[in-house]
Amino acid sequence: MNAQTERLTLSGPAGAIEAVRDSAALAAGAAPRGVAIIAHPHPLFGGTLDNKVVQTLARAFVQCGWTTVRFNFRGVGATEGVHDDGRGELQDLLAVAQQAAPEGPLALAGFSFGAFVTSHAVEALWAPRQMDKIVLVGTAASRFTVAPVPADAHLRTLVLHGEEDDTVPLAAVMDWARPQTLPVTVVPGGGHFFHGQLPLLKNLVVRHLQSGR
């Protein structure tokens, strides 16, 4: 798979937002399937747009013909502002979506803290603009109040979690998903960062992206 990478500077509520756009090398005349916005893990614990899980998600989307935009939340890298416990970060994500994907098919994905922020972006955007695909990995349900996934978005949503995640226990994600009857795909033996299992993670995401709604 060949991909083209471009660095972007977008405008956010706290100032400039550093972002990277990864595009699939498409045949002449072919259009991308849409734009996928991918959110990184907790900024105060080293989370950036270059996180390995985030990059794996981007590769999966690009393989399936999507253009992806990974970005740094406020206070990370060259993105201006300071950490805001998810409130400002939600506004960052919404600003990125508005500028990088103003129209056409949209997908949202996030890892850990990024999955928490993504859940609230889905909640905010679903009524005016339904996403084609949603991917939540290592969702930080034990540390933050994760928004429920809209019922009519369940078939478009993939929730992935490691069986042996010691950062966000699997039980916390099951407790969040159970009232929604939202399926959770569990990676046997998987930890929070899916060490040694990133190829499997990618394949599971690709399978989801290739499935119907």
Where are these regions (language model features)?
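Acidic catalytic loop of the alpha/beta-hydrolase fold
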Residues: 142-143, 163-168, 192-193
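Conserved loop-alpha-helix segment in the C-terminal half of the alpha/beta-hydrolase fold
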Residues: 163-182
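Catalytic histidine-centered segment of alpha/beta-hydrolase-like enzymes
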Residues: 190-202
